[in-house]
């Protein structure tokens, strides 16, 4: 319904843009609109691939808050990120891949405090392995 659409636009901070074509929105606004569209159908699983890449701080924080809120409501969220800070803030469990191979699957707290592989340790610390 129109009311649901307006509610989702409010949630992502775009309610005043309801009549503006998506192509005229900034990158951050388009990301927020994409998330609103995905949430509108109320999926049980949400797949997000780098949802905050190149976003302004306002959009980044808003999207992270929505992700946390949806997870608290019981929604399963699979998030791809290279941002270790974001992974720390949002993840309950980490699947760490390197060169397409799964190297670790563990609770987020364990990943950041006791990584099992040198690749994970290096990535967490921002070092490059040769």
Model-derived regions, located:
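H-loop/switch region of ABC-family ATPase nucleotide-binding domains
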Residues: 81-82
């Amino acid at each position: 319904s129109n009311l649901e659409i307006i509610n989702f636009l409010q949630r992502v901070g775009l309610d005043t843009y309801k009549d503006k074509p998506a192509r005229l929105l900034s990158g951050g606004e388009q990301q927020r609109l994409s998330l609103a569209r995905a949430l509108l159908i109320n999926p049980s699983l949400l797949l997000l691939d780098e949802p905050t890449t190149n976003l302004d701080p306002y959009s980044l924080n808003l999207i992270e808050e929505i992700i946390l809120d949806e997870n608290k409501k019981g929604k399963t969220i699979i998030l791809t990120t290279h941002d270790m800070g974001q992974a720390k803030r949002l993840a309950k469990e980490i699947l760490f891949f390197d060169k397409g191979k799964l190297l670790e699957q563990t609770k987020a707290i364990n990943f950041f405090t006791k990584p099992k592989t040198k690749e994970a340790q290096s990535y967490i610390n921002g070092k490059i392995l040769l």
